[in-house]
Swiss-Prot record:
Signal peptide: none annotated. Residues 1-20, 38-63, 71-81 have a biased composition (Basic and acidic residues). This is Pre-mRNA-splicing factor syf2. It comes from Emericella nidulans (strain FGSC A4 / ATCC 38163 / CBS 112.46 / NRRL 194 / M139). PANTHER family: GCIP-INTERACTING PROTEIN P29, PRE-MRNA-SPLICING FACTOR SYF2. The lineage of its organism: Eukaryota, Fungi, Dikarya, Ascomycota, Pezizomycotina. Associated with the spliceosome.
Amino acid sequence: MSSERDQEQLSLEESREGEGKSTTSQTESNASDVAEDPSTKEQTGDKEDSAAARARERKERFKALQARAKSATERNLKETAAETQRLATDPSLLSSLSRKHAFASHNLLKADTEAAGEDFERKRAWDWTVDESEKWDRRMEKKQRHRDDVAFQDYTQDARKVYKRQLREMKPDLEGYENEKMAAIEKAAASGDLEIVETNDGEMIAVDKNGTFYSTADTIGFTESKPDRAAVDKLVADLRKAEEVRLKKRRDRRGGDEDGDVTYINEKNKQFNQKLARFYNKYTTEIRDSFERGTMI
């Protein structure tokens, strides 16, 4: 029995040693395979290269951001300095100084010229041509007429001034007018009311066949015209401006007495009440005060 047990133990030990050797040999073979596999080495190298490339890219982007931040800071400082200088400089003061300098230079030149016994106006005219001098004279004459025309003369003259001012403020749309004109000509030519004829010298003229294209005293085609939104807004703005001017003149005529008692219906009635007040206020003041206090019997 003991011999059989010894044989079994020996066989178990031999089997264990064989399994250990096989495991060791398999591990060594796997390690050798891994060590000798070139694809694994390439994959590891690619990972390291990609990581380095990403690091370099991040570094370059960070440098670019730093450069942009630096340039933005410098630009902001320059703009801030320019804005500070602009705010510190008073434009009205600069224009006043330039006017004073021009006036002083004019007076100095005039004094020097008169001291030398020369004609100042003649000497100053040497700097201008005849055309420039005539244009300047016409401009000064027009300016003087405008100064003389400011005061109220009559309602016809006042209406003429308003009309001239509106003409100056009106900006005609010549391009839009030409486009509408060409569209109307093409429409009339397509309908047969207008015929385009070429002359011998190559000029194109439009012939009104039925006498309906060109307007006459009996033409009512303008009633079909519909103004655009901008023209309507401009008309509304002009009407509001005229109303504001009218109310301002009305307040100026009243002398700012808007909060006082209104005892008149128009300007003429106001003047009449003022005349009455100059003569009868000394007699009626006590009566009016009694009415206001409610003690009048």
